[in-house]
Amino acid sequence: MPRKMVVIFGASNILWMVFAVSQASKMEIFLEPRVAAQIGDVISLTCSTTGCETPSFSWRTQIDSPLNGKVKNEGNNSTLTMDPVSFNNEHAYLCTATCGSKKLEKGIQVEIYSFPKDPEIQLSGPLEVGKPVTVTCLVRDVYPFDRLEMNLLNGNDLLQSKDFLEPMEKKSLETKSLEVTFTPTNEDIGKGLVCRAQLHMDEIDFEPKERETTKELQVYISPRNTFISVTPSMRLQEGGSVTMTCASEGLPPPQIFWSKKLDNGNLQLLSGNATLTLIAMRLEDSGTYVCEGVNEVGKDGKEVELIVQEKPFTVEISPGPQIIAQIGDSVVLTCGVTDCESPSFSWRTQIDSPLSGTVKVEGAKSTLTLSPVNLENEHSYLCTVTCGHKKLEKGIKVDLYSFPRDPEVEMSGLLVDGNPVTVSCEVPNVYPSDRLEIELFKGETIIESKSFLEDMDKKSLETKSLEMTFIPTTEDTGKVLVCLAKLHIDEMEFEPKQRQSTQTLYVNVAPRDTTVVVSPSSIVEEGSPVNMTCSSDGLPAPNILWSRRLSNGRLQSLSEDPILTLTSAKMEDSGIYVCEGINQAGISRKEVELIIQVAPKDIQLIAFPSESVKEGDTVIISCTCGNVPKTWIILKKKAETGDTVLKSRDGAYTIHKVQLEDAGVYECESKNEAGLQLRSLTLDVKGRENNKDYFSPELLVLYCASSLIIPAIGMIIYFARRANMKGSYSLVEAQKSKV
């Protein structure tokens, strides 16, 4: 589109015309000497005045040619517009401003040029490596062309430069060009052709004074080095398939076309892909196949010859030449035929024994099912396929084994520390048993192993076992007993070939070291609390059972707590107590005797025949204590000079022919570990008159009677004590004696 340019006289290319109408003022005008205008654009020249209210303006060219523009006056401004700029506007223009009698005139030179478009790059043909090509650079509608300079570059390399300095015969817009011929190479790929044009008009100011165009080089390479790969082979079986892959070098990458050469030499297009796959090939698919790589600058071809051969039928038997099966499983043998439309099948064993299976035919496949498979099926089986006049036979061997369960580990009894136990490891229903090995481990140590290498009389499922006896200890607790069974059949592939069972050992310990602790003591006073604590070692920890032994020897159960407590012991609680530690491995027993003591009581101290006797009489002093066992009896005679311990027998002291000095206080002390009790009496001895020996008949009778009665009384007292009291009495010998 044409541009519009406004030029104002004065500063910055503006034409100012200043008129001073005042009698004392002067008019001055400031303007640039030149202005540039491009042909086809619009330019406006504006003339302005100051200092005059009503100036008048006029425009003309310096040579009085037509203005070729429109003038518009507004106040102090006058504008000359050239729309569009043409060669007729290339003049020096004058603006005259009149204010009263004053006139002022200024001029401006309008320079005309044309440089509207970037250069154009043209190629004589596609850029092909190794082939020359002509590059033309065009600059259209340029003026003045004698100021034009053109450069053509390939990347940063200058190919050609040209100036147009010939004189112009007339003013006109010209199209100028620069031509260069060069041969592209691989190194030119990705480079750019640059056409640069410069309009050298330094005397005037305009933009742009330089234009350039860049064209990226699209360098082509004609297809070459075309090659073909064939998979699996160029010789094929009828019904097979083939994949042919073609590749060709070039730039841009060539497109691949596959064709087949007909008998008349023409090509039959098959595919536009690089890979051609032919399936279910027939004999007529034999022939020559052509691959062509094609791009914009050429093509390159390669041929391959395919030969399709007649294919014979084949027989396959699955799952393979050998099948490993476990007795009791289901086995399916499959015989398949290919490349035969109507085959017939037959099955047999290699030794012509019964098949013992079910045969089924479906099209090109026949199956023999053995379910469940047993020892009678351990044979080599043959499948015969007849197709027309041809027969093919394939065989498969059925090998059997039986190893269905993990070993079974059993103990002859409970594991008790120190007691022998027999371990049995049994492997059920194994075949062939002569390949079996059983190993017995305790922890990681093998303790027994056994192989069964004896010949088998017949094919059968066998149950084999390994036994051993060992003495467990507490160190065995936590260890693992492992029974490992291995079926050594290396020539057969199956899993598992070894099985194992484990049993963690827990060794019991029969109760032992049973102890009883009585607190505070096994002998206590009546009313005191008693704790009897029982403990016993063993695995598992023994249970505690408290019992009391009765008078008939039997045990009376009391408690299953380790601690037996009597909060207030009574005398009848005395006796034998039994603690038993019991677990599944045995029993341990401990007895303790508990004695409940009672402080002495009911003491009786008597003098016989009386506490008052005559000198010469016989006196028995007797001390008894009721129903208390293990009591000490001490008889004393009190005196100021000190007590005298009397020699008593069963608590009785006899004084024959009592004397006056025998009179006094007699004391009985009854004590045991629970306490003591005292009793005393005063014996009064009266003297005889005249202090003469007197022996009357009456005294003789009394003496004789007392000699019989006193021992009798003593015996009565003794047996009464023994019958009615729990305990015994002591005679005091010097100090005291315990009975």
Curated annotation (Swiss-Prot):
Disulfide bonds join 47-95, 52-99, 137-195, 246-291, 335-383, 534-579. Glycans are attached at residues 76-77, 273, 531. GO terms for cellular component: extracellular region; plasma membrane. Cleaved by the metalloproteinase ADAM17 to generate the soluble form. Sialoglycoprotein. The keyword DNA-binding does not apply. GO terms for biological process: cell adhesion; cell-cell adhesion. The chain crosses the membrane at residues 699-720. Keywords: Cell adhesion, Cell membrane, Disulfide bond, Glycoprotein, Immunoglobulin domain, Membrane, Repeat, Secreted, Signal, Transmembrane, Transmembrane helix, Ubl conjugation. Residues 721-739 are cytoplasmic. Residues 25-698 are extracellular. Pfam families: C2-set, I-set, ig, Ig_3. InterPro entries: ICAM_VCAM, ICAM_VCAM_N, Ig-like_dom, Ig-like_dom_sf, Ig-like_fold, Ig_C2-set, Ig_I-set, Ig_sub. It comes from the Eukaryota. Residues 25-105, 109-212, 223-309, 312-399, 408-506, 511-595, 600-684 form the Ig-like C2-type domain. Residues 1-24 form the signal peptide. One of its GO terms (molecular function) is integrin binding. Either the first or the fourth Ig-like C2-type domain is required for VLA4-dependent cell adhesion. Cell adhesion glycoprotein predominantly expressed on the surface of endothelial cells that plays an important role in immune surveillance and inflammation. Acts as a major regulator of leukocyte adhesion to the endothelium through interaction with different types of integrins. During inflammatory responses, binds ligands on the surface of activated endothelial cells to initiate the activation of calcium channels and the plasma membrane-associated small GTPase RAC1 leading to leukocyte transendothelial migration. This is Vascular cell adhesion protein 1. It comes from Canis lupus familiaris (Dog). The gene is VCAM1.
